[in-house]
């Protein structure tokens, strides 16, 4: 048959696309893996050529005639597999019974080898999550490429010579004692079972061969939003595998692959609890989470929900809605966040609702809304693939966003300039072209110096400024004193380095900036973000491939929870509560009058609780007794509350002070959507059943709402999502059904069958003027 090859395709790829199977061992078709051509399992015969060709690396040419099933090709493949089979453990004793190797051996009708077996290396059980069985290793080097080229961790290598050659970790250390970060990429790549998850083999290293159920979902940890597949048995997660999602391309980190033991932890709450009458609250109270019955008693769901709602109603009816407050969670779903804020606004009668974004990127969102009219990123972190300069400031992605960091490291390896700016000198400095270690709290001085150089040396984009910004002349005037020479003694970075970095960022064809909570968790966090907005917009480094502004979101649904309205001064999609037209729209949608006044923030709520102004709280999935600034202050505030309802997985430090504790569902136990740092709305799916009497979070919220007098009738998270989509323009053309089919859609999206816009603001900004607002900043001493 005559076939056409696409540009850059190999013979193997063309054959795969045509449904023709060619064996492969050292080659992985997954994203990020280059072909090596060293195993010779994929040999094909090309007419007119004397020797066989490795189809994984050979590219077709016009008129080439390829025979994938010639006698020579098939014989060569069988020979390769028979040689490798000689050193493999017997299949019944295989570490992975259905590995790529054994699957292909079966298709080639090979079960044993005529060749003598070599010595079997001892297994390495030193790692808590993985096992190493070099008796199954075929030296395909996939694990080396996985570690060095995909994850860019540089732990695995090939050492020694001849028959002594083998895969090693660092300097031939046991895996568990090496610098391995346990991302598990090598395990996922290994075609033979030489590297295995510890949960899949027995004490002798033999595959348990348990039938596993597969459920596709999304990782519940950081804001990257990796797509995953849970592989479960008997209501336990046995293995987690990476899926080819838009944010991870099958990559995972240690948490995403191995961090799910908490779901079946013995301390999980499995029945509602009500505080005992003989256990008064105290700020210093500590309770053993394994034995909450010293301070709580068990209750039925009806009793617990009635008790929870009665206390909240009592305070609302006696003192008014503003005596109540609610905290939602950035670790739950969009639907749960939406329901929490709706409950507080319509059931409590107040806008006193917030979540942990207040303590992380609220300053970034404030500056972004002010400057460019949107609180979300302008480009995904994948945009670094097209960038010539990548600036990372106030973030430690190798530890906090490990999968995103793999793309930064890869970009640096291919030649992009990586500028890392941080007082600590993070792990990313190893890959940096410029590492600026500055004095803590002097962010504005440093960033203003960069802007000063760009304006003074006229490195800015005049056409872009004229068309898409406002306030440039004021910025030019206000930035004049902030020369690198004047700022160097303040920030601790020499003027020459500041100048070089400014020039590199401004003059590259594509520069992108990423920032984290290192610059947002400041009294001048908003000013820090204003500086970055000015830096990007005056140089025209927004709205094109490889450019943009990207605050790296911390938790898995900080973006989505904020979008869903879990913020005291805005309704869903950042629509101001003080705007009469906006408020009228939500009053019509929700069927009740709404408070026209902005609510209190997390910090203000805790202050008000300490002062006795906030008397009751509902806390769903948050732990302010551990996450708020000044823990003694936070715990004292919680202990003073007349009525505290906590909904969580464990008896947290906050739940210790609760009047009623409601056992909730973990992420693998629920359906729902989340929105990652890239603006990708993604579908999470239930893989496990909740333990004991625990319940789905959306159900618990609705049951409280009903007891607060609301007539909610949701039957599934999809009902909640559809209501959200009706009041949130950002979800236009992103239906629940589409998400269920596609798993991920980026907003904004122009049509039900169109891909969302990954890169935005190429033709202006969603501000009243259509322009970015440049806001000058001043150097302020740290508080």
Segments from the language model and where they lie:
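Non-catalytic terminal/interface segments that mediate subunit docking, oligomerization
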Residues: 232, 241, 252, 545, ...
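Glycine-rich loop at the start of a catalytic domain that most often binds anionic cofactors/ligands
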Residues: 36-42, 338-345, 527
């Amino acid at each position: 048959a005559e076939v056409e090859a696409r540009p850059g395709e190999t013979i193997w790829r063309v054959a795969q696309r045509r449904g023709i199977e060619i064996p492969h061992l050292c080659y992985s078709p997954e994203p990020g893996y280059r072909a090596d051509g060293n195993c010779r399992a994929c040999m094909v015969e090309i007419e007119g050529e004397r020797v066989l060709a490795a189809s994984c690396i050979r590219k077709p040419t016009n008129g080439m005639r390829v025979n994938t099933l010639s006698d020579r090709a098939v014989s060569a493949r069988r020979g390769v597999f028979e040689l490798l089979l000689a050193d493999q453990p017997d299949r019944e004793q295989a570490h992975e019974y259905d590995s790529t190797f054994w699957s292909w051996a079966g298709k080639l009708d090979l079960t044993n080898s005529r060749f003598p077996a070599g010595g079997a290396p001892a297994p390495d059980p030193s790692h808590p999550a993985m096992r190493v069985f070099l008796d199954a290793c075929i030296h395909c080097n996939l694990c080396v490429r996985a570690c060095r080229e995909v994850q860019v961790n540089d732990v695995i290598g090939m050492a020694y010579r001849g028959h002594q050659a083998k895969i090693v970790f660092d300097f031939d250390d046991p895996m568990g004692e090496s610098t391995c970060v346990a991302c598990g990429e090598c395990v996922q790549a290994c075609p033979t079972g030489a590297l295995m998850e510890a949960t899949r083999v027995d004490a002798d290293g033999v595959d348990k061969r348990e039938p596993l159920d597969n459920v596709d979902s999304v990782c519940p940890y950081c804001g990257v939003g990796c797509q995953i597949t849970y592989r479960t048995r008997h209501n336990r997660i046995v293995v987690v595998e990476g899926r080819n999602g838009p944010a991870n391309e099958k990559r995972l980190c240690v948490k995403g692959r191995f961090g799910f033991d908490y779901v079946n932890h013995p301390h999980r709450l499995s029945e509602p609890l009500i505080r005992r009458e003989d256990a008064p609250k105290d700020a210093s109270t500590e309770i053993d989470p394994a034995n909450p019955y010293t301070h709580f008693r068990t209750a039925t769901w009806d009793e617990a929900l009635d008790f929870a709602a009665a206390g909240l109603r009592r305070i609302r009816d006696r003192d008014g809605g503003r005596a109540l407050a609610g905290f939602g969670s950035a670790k739950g779903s969009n639907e749960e966040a939406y329901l929490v804020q709706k409950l507080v606004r319509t059931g409590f009668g107040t806008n006193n609702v917030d979540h942990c974004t207040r303590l992380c990127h609220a300053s970034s969102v404030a500056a972004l809304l002010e400057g460019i009219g949107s609180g979300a990123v302008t480009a995904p972190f994948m945009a670094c693939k097209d960038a010539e300069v990548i600036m990372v400031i106030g973030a430690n992605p190798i530890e906090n966003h490990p999968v995103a960091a793999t793309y930064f490291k890869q970009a640096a390896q291919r030649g992009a300039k990586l500028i890392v700016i941080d007082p600590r000198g993070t792990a990313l400095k190893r890959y940096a072209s410029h590492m600026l270690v500055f004095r803590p709290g002097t962010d504005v001085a440093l960033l203003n110096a960069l802007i000063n150089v760009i304006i003074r040396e006229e490195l800015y984009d005049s056409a872009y400024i004229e068309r898409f910004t406002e306030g440039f002349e004021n910025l030019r005037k206000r930035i004049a004193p902030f020369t690198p020479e004047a700022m160097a003694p303040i920030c601790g970075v020499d003027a020459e380095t500041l100048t070089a970095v400014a020039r590199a960022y401004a003059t590259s064809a594509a520069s992108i900036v990423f920032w984290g909570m290192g610059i947002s968790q400041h009294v001048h966090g908003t000013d820090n973000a204003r500086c970055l907005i000015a830096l990007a917009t005056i140089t025209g480094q927004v709205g094109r491939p490889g450019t943009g502004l990207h605050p790296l979101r911390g938790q898995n649904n900080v973006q989505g929870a904020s979008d869903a309205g879990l913020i005291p001064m805005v309704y869903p999609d950042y629509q101001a509560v003080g705007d009469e037209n906006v408020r009228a729209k939500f009053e019509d949608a929700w069927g009740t009058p709404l408070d026209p006044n902005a609510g209190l923030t997390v910090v203000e709520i805790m202050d008000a609780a300490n002062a006795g102004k906030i008397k009751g709280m509902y806390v769903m999935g948050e732990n302010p007794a551990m996450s708020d600034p000044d823990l003694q202050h936070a715990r004292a505030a919680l202990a003073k509350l007349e009525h505290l309802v906590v909904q969580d997985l464990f008896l947290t430090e906050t739940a210790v002070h609760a009047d009623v504790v409601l056992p909730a569902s973990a992420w693998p136990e629920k359906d729902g959507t989340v929105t990652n740092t890239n603006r990708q709305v993604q579908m999470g799916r239930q893989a496990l059943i909740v333990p004991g009497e625990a319940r789905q979070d959306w159900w618990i919220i609705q049951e409280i709402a009903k007891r607060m007098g609301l007539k909610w009738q949701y039957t599934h998270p999809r009902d909640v999502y559809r209501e959200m989509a009706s009041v949130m323009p950002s979800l236009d053309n992103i239906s629940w059904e589409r998400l269920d089919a596609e798993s991920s859609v980026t907003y904004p999206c122009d049509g039900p069958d169109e891909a969302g816009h990954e890169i935005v603001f190429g033709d202006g900004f969603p501000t009243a003027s259509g322009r970015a607002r440049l806001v000058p900043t001043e150097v302020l001493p740290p508080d």
